[in-house]
Amino acid sequence: MRLIAHRGNLNGPNPLVENDPQRITYCIDEGYDVEIDVRYDHHTNMLWLGHDEPQHKVNWFWIAGRRDRLWIHCKDVATLHEFSTKTSGYNFFFHDKDDYTLTSK
């Protein structure tokens, strides 16, 4: 069984730690998978974590190092497209008001 920390939350919502890279690493170290919200900026080739807006900048190396434990919620179509061009086993998905969502794995 896999336990997934939604945005890095372990005990209910906590906006102060949601999608924070340090919190995500902590959850993974504690044995959890983590769902993260990601946006890709094609101008800078950087990735941003954040539910409603970009908040925490990370790079591809950071994502790749944790990819086996991440459930990557692509927050827009451009981010979905970028992840779909990668062949390194990322588990990503996109949805917008759907009854069901499929991931890439």
Region annotations inferred by a language model:
Residues 1-105:
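Phosphate-group recognition and catalysis centered on beta-loop-alpha active-site segments
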